[in-house]
Amino acid sequence: MAPQRKALRDWLYLFIISIQLFGMLALDLVSFYPKALYAHPSSPLHFLLTLRNFYVSSTGDPFFAQDSPHQPWFDIFLCIEALVQLPLAAYLVSQLASSSNKPTSGPAELAGLAFGCVTFMGAAACCAELWHMGEDVVSADKKGPLLYGTYLPFAVIPAVLAVDMSLRLLPRVQQSDAKAKTQ
């Protein structure tokens, strides 16, 4: 029997989750870092504020604009991102990048399922909020690219990831159930 190779979609997941991991660390979660690391121009991570300001000015993203405070639901989603998505993303990147010839393991598939569900939920909520925002919050010329180019892909791809991982896990669970019934 020929050795199994990593599925092409796993390389796509690695690419997407790596981008998300970078976005979490460089944009989304900066406010959780100690202010001494980023607040002052001489701080070692001050470049992250410059990066965030560039991102906001380029995209018009109202969720990260300095002049609009976060809604409470968004603050909770950032906490979930820090406590759940970040560790899952780091684990998945390490697992998906580990070997070009190794298919995913059960634990990696379970982590992918959890990551996909949580990420889909957060991004879908942002998409819904963005969809309903008026021009007083986000300009019409920025809204479409922001919704369809930035947030929607990070809802759709994790949803596909969650379905894919659940379909991979299902035979493992069924096989385990079959073994348990024969014992």
What is each residue range found by the language model?
Residues 2-86:
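N-terminal helical submodule of small eukaryotic multi-pass membrane proteins
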Residues 27-38, 121-133:
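Helix-to-loop junction signature of class
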Residues 122-183:
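Alpha-helical transmembrane segments of multi-pass integral membrane proteins
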Residues 78-115:
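Signature of small four-pass
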Residues 60-69, 88-98, 125-132:
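Membrane-helix exit/interface motif
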Residues 1-8, 177-183:
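Plant-biased recognition of short, low-complexity, intrinsically disordered N-terminal tails
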Residues 4-11, 69-72, 102-106, 138-145:
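Juxtamembrane loop-transmembrane helix junctions in multi-pass integral membrane proteins
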Residues 15-26, 83-87, 113-125, 149-163:
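Hydrophobic alpha-helical cores of multi-pass transmembrane domains in eukaryotic membrane proteins
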